[in-house]
Amino acid sequence: MGLAATKTKQRFGLDPRNTTWSNDKSRFGHKYLEKLGWEPGKGLGHASHAMSTHIKVTIKDDTMGLGAKLKKKEKKDEFDSGECAGLDVFQRILGRLNGKEEVIADELEKQRKENIINGKWGIHFVKGEVLSSTWDADTMQLKSYSYDKKEITADDAEDAKVSGKHRDRKSRAKREKSNNAALKEKCRDIDRTRKSKRKEKEQEKEKNREKKHNGKEHKEKEHKEKKDKKDKKEKKEKKEKKEKKEKKHKEKSNKRLRSSDSIDDPEATKPSKKSKTKAADSDNVTRDSMLQPRASAASPPPTISTRLSVRSKWIRQKRAAVMDPKALNEIFMVT
């Protein structure tokens, strides 16, 4: 345990070896064993001279399974070092002293290789062995099984030839069929590709034709619309000119009629003079009315909310200034 290892506190009780329990002769188990013939100091079982010491209990302070360390400590053979480091070197020294250095070195190297192979990926490799039925250990060669050749008669030979020819014919026919089928499939594929290319070309041509046709129609529509607009404008202008001419003609005719009437009836001009005097009088009245104060027979102002009270105050002041003739004379510079 180094300084970097985890620190574990061990707590020992008052009786770690549990001697009080083992020395207590008043318990039921002790009395029952004495009735069966057991005496203190003897071992249990058939052999009474066996070990009678207490069992040692170790505290488990790791996450390994039960018996993991014991399995590692077990030695498979005399060359297995287990957990003890440097034991293989010690065994080589002993072998050198005993004159068996080569044997021990070969055995240790073999064990090292097996440990490397078996420890990889957690897989246990099993070496395959040669079957005894196919390997001859004496001659160190594979066994060869030779069958006795039967005597073949002439008829059998002819039958074999005929059957061989028949097989050859069948194989040729199958090959020819397969070749013909492959050629047919190739021809079909070529025809399909040609047809697809032709269809694509025709579709492209049709699209181009439609585009051209649509473009021409669009241009014709635009040209027609422009012509219609021009015609409408010209018609409007002609109508306006005609209306203006008719108005002028009517005005001229009215003037001529008036002039002819005035020559025939000189008194017809009098009402016009009267109308002029009336218009002048109306102008004078309006100017005087502006200077004169208006009638103050107005109803009392209605109640106004507080929000518009300031604005209504200014409006009243303006109205009062307009109603005052002196203020108006000062404004218009009238003396």
From Swiss-Prot:
One of its GO terms (cellular component) is nucleolus. Residues 183-209 have a biased composition (Basic and acidic residues). PANTHER family: G PATCH DOMAIN CONTAINING PROTEIN, PROTEIN PXR1. It is found in: Nucleus, Nucleolus. It comes from the Eukaryota. Keywords: Nucleus, Ribosome biogenesis, rRNA processing. One of its GO terms (biological process) is rRNA processing. Residues 163-175, 226-257 have a biased composition (Basic residues). The keyword Phosphoprotein does not apply. This is Protein PXR1. Belongs to the PINX1 family. Residues 155-310 are annotated as: Disordered. PROSITE patterns: G_PATCH. It comes from Eremothecium gossypii (strain ATCC 10895 / CBS 109.51 / FGSC 9923 / NRRL Y-1056) (Yeast). The gene is PXR1. GO terms for molecular function: nucleic acid binding. Involved in rRNA-processing at A0, A1 and A2 sites and negatively regulates telomerase. Residues 25-71 form the G-patch domain. It holds the Pfam family G-patch.
